[in-house]
């Protein structure tokens, strides 16, 4: 017989109730009353919370569908800064002036740097994007010439548009098709049933580095795509795992180019990783760098201070220096034309662009396939000591202090996403959407769904209360006022059943009204 608690979870999942809710205490500042509200966890993986993952999947489908064949230019309204943002920028300017004066006077800059960092954090929390300082020059210059082994790309004059070309049929019908593109990484060795035929000959090191930097290669492809197209190409892309556990890209593009041009762009796209070399292991086993306050990490054998991250990059300023790694796409490039509102477009959205969004990259590995499981384990071993970012502690293994080094770091103990087994090296976002895709953020799409429900129930989606009326506080575990999770789930299940019945009743009434109106017109 099943456990009662399991039945509760199953019923909650079937009704779309979050099974890992975050309890919050909501205080009404007007009446002084407080109540406990369960906020959905918002998980995107089905293994963590199926209802939240399904809800996010539906939002992504709507986002992809609305922007793919948009026939008008999206307009992003300018947002005026708030009073808080203006105040913080003014405060930032005053602190920067005082910090510069302290630097000229030879004073200690640490207090000023801490104050500036705190204001910068407040600016980010207020909703401002980017940095008030912009890009800080490092003094290092890198040649922008293309690699000699990369083919050149054509370049069209850019026009201010996000829409593709319009085609007209002989009978006068106008079409604005779009494209579906699939890009893969190169081969690292022969694969059979999702695992290498010869694991010893499989290039795990290259596979690991390609996975870690795959998002940068995608950025380069989009840059080249826009340069060749001549307009501001908009895209909705998802990064999915292949059976061989390597990431590949599905990209919905608004507008069209020829298949030959798409393949030419993919062949000419590359990304160079200009990081310090990792060919020579300096510290291994029990011999690891030691931390010294005010200095950083030292070589325990000689007492010498290890080169900092900036010093290691300065050593790459030599014209003869080679990048740590060069990424390219593989030969398998697929490009298809797609018309909006067709079954093919819906099929590509459901079965390619969003099919695996509720699963982690590692979940494509069949646990009942020992060869594939061993393949995943070998991939994890290859990633263990591979640096994933400038701040990765693995740089200590190769005699370089990571950027922003701090005590307690050690090779093989990086907590970055790329080193976690469920990501298999890919640390980036699974969904990549350009800013002018659907002219809506994911929050806007979520608000659309909420507005539809409220409208169906005959309620207003715009008549909101004072945003400052309620204050929200997280409830810590063990709070005596917090009911058990099972009890809270039962309450949410009852609420969901009541809401569904009410929604179905209003929909039925609306259908009857529409039917009656149709009958009157017909009469």
Q: Model-found features: residue ranges?
A:
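Histidine-centered divalent-metal-coordination microenvironment in nucleic-acid enzymes
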Residues: 49, 181, 232-266, 353
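Hydrophobic, Leu/Ile/Phe/Ala-enriched alpha-helical segments that form helix-helix packing faces
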Residues: 217-229, 265-277, 357
């Amino acid at each position: 017989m099943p456990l009662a608690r399991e039945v509760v979870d199953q019923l909650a999942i079937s009704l779309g109730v979050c099974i890992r809710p975050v309890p919050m205490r909501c205080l009404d500042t007007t009446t002084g009353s407080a109540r406990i509200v369960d906020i959905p966890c918002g998980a995107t993986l089905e293994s963590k919370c199926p209802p939240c993952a399904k809800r996010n999947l539906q939002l992504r489908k709507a986002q992809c569908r609305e922007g793919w064949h948009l026939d008008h230019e999206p307009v992003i309204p300018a947002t005026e800064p708030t009073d808080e943002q203006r105040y913080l920028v003014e405060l930032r300017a005053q602190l920067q002036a005082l910090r510069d004066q302290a630097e000229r006077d030879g004073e200690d800059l640490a207090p000023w740097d801490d104050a500036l960092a705190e204001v910068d954090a407040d600016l980010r929390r207020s909703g401002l994007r980017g940095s008030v300082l912009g890009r800080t020059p490092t003094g290092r210059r890198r040649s922008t010439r293309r690699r000699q082994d990369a083919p050149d790309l054509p370049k069209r004059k850019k026009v201010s548009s996000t829409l593709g070309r319009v085609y007209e049929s002989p009978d006068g019908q106008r079409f604005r098709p779009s494209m579906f593109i699939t890009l893969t990484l190169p081969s690292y060795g022969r694969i059979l049933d999702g695992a290498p035929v010869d694991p010893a000959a499989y290039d795990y090191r290259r596979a690991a580095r390609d996975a870690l930097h795959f998002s940068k290669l995608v950025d380069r492809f989009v840059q080249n795509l826009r340069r060749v197209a001549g307009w501001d190409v908009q895209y909705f892309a998802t990064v999915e795992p292949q059976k061989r556990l390597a990431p590949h890209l599905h990209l919905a593009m608004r507008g069209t180019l020829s298949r030959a041009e798409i393949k030419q762009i993919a062949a000419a796209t590359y990304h160079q990783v200009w990081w310090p070399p990792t060919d020579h292991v300096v510290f291994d086993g029990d011999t690891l760098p030691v931390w010294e306050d005010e200095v950083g990490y030292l070589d325990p054998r000689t007492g010498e201070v290890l080169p900092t991250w900036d010093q290691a990059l300065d050593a790459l300023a030599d014209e003869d220096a080679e990048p740590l790694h060069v990424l390219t796409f593989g030969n398998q490039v697929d490009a298809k034309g797609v018309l909006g509102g067709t079954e093919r477009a819906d099929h590509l959205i459901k079965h390619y662009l969003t099919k695996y969004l509720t699963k982690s990259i590692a979940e494509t590995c069949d646990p009942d396939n020992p060869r594939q499981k061993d393949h995943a384990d070998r991939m994890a071993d290859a990633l263990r000591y591979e640096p994933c970012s400038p701040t990765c502690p693995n740089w200590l293994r190769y005699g370089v202090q990571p950027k922003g080094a701090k005590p307690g770091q050690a090779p093989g103990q990086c907590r970055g996403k790329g080193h976690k087994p469920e990501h298999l090296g890919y640390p980036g976002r699974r969904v990549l959407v350009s800013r002018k895709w659907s002219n809506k953020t994911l929050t806007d799409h979520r608000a659309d769904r909420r507005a539809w429900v409220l409208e169906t129930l005959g309620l207003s989606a715009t008549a909101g209360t004072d945003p400052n009326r309620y204050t929200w506080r997280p409830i810590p575990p063990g709070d005596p006022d917090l009911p058990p999770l099972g009890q809270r789930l039962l309450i949410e299940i009852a609420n969901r059943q009541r809401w569904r019945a009410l929604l179905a009743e209003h929909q039925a009434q609306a259908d009857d009204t529409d039917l009656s109106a149709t009958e009157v017109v017909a009469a």
